[in-house]
Amino acid sequence: MPHVLVRSIVRPDKADAVMATLLDAGYPAVTKVSVFGRGKQRGLKVGDIHYDELPKELLMTVIPVADKEFVVSRIIEAARTGTKGNFGDGKIFVSPVEEVYTVSTGKKEE
């Protein structure tokens, strides 16, 4: 069965909600990495101070391709701020996964 890698870059205060949503939806396997970066807004300016890079959380999970739309919609619901969302809420990237191997056994997963 084909799989995809879903990478979500979300606000730090939304990461736990996204992870809980994925767990509740039946997708417990998530890798979480703290990252810094910027999007189209090129950082944030508060008064005279400019923050070039902002803290975010990168969440990664591999899922069956058939579940892609469902999982992406759950992530959006959990990560969005406000009723319509705001700049800086994040991005979701979906990429095909060619092969998966288990490190402990060295075996290719099907």
Task: Give each language-model segment a name.
Residues 1-110:
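Positively charged, small/polar-rich N-terminal and surface patches that mediate targeting and assembly
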